[in-house]
């Protein structure tokens, strides 16, 4: 069995991480240069914070977010319409045995970060943090 078979449930390999970063960088470059002619994409600045590769390197999941977070569904639909073009451009710029199929998903890490910030700002957590801080100061004295 190959090493990739063992890593399906575990952490990504160095090769997966390296290829994902190359694809992320190339995709960001393509979207920032407005190479794709689509009115929806031209009206947005799109960030690509993360790309994840399958163990066989044949599938890339690109997490995208338009600046401001508005119209995410229309942006993903537009990217899906131009998936073949983007795949061919990536294949020309990155020399791999196979050009990976690309899936686009909304990046929800910003929403998750906002939820964590809201939890940390809640009165119950503030009270607990203040109590812990007071106890730490008393122990230090």
Curated annotation (Swiss-Prot):
Entry GO MF terms: ribosomal small subunit binding
GO CC field: cytosol
Localisation per UniProt entry: Cytoplasm
Keyword Nuclease (UniProt): no
Gene3D superfamilies in the record: 3.30.300.20
Keywords, sorted A to Z: Cytoplasm, Ribosome biogenesis
Coiled coil regions in record: none
PROSITE patterns in alphabetical order: RBFA (PS01319)
Keyword Cytoplasm: yes
Gene Ontology BP terms: maturation of SSU-rRNA
Entry function: One of several proteins that assist in the late maturation steps of the functional core of the 30S ribosomal subunit. Associates with free 30S ribosomal subunits (but not with 30S subunits that are part of 70S ribosomes or polysomes). Required for efficient processing of 16S rRNA. May interact with the 5'-terminal helix region of 16S rRNA.
NCBIfam families: PRK00521.2-5, rbfA
UniProt record similarity statement: Belongs to the RbfA family.
Subunit and interaction comment: Monomer. Binds 30S ribosomal subunits, but not 50S ribosomal subunits or 70S ribosomes.
Protein name as catalogued: Ribosome-binding factor A
Gene source species: Beijerinckia indica subsp. indica (strain ATCC 9039 / DSM 1715 / NCIMB 8712)
Protein encoded by which gene: rbfA
């Amino acid at each position: 069995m190959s090493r990739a078979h063992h890593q399906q449930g575990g952490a990504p390999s160095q090769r997966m991480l390296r290829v994902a970063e190359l694809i992320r960088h190339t995709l960001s470059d393509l979207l920032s240069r407005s190479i794709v002619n689509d009115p929806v994409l031209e009206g947005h600045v799109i960030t690509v914070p993360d790309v994840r590769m399958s163990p066989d390197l044949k599938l890339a999941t690109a997490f995208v977010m338009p600046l401001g977070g508005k119209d995410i569904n229309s942006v993903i639909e537009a990217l899906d319409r131009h998936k073949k073009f983007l795949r061919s451009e990536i294949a020309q710029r990155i020399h791999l045995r196979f050009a990976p199929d690309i899936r686009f998903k909304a990046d929800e890490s910003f929403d998750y970060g906002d939820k964590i910030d809201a939890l940390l700002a809640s009165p119950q957590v503030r009270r607990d943090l203040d109590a812990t801080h007071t106890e730490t100061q008393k122990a230090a004295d």
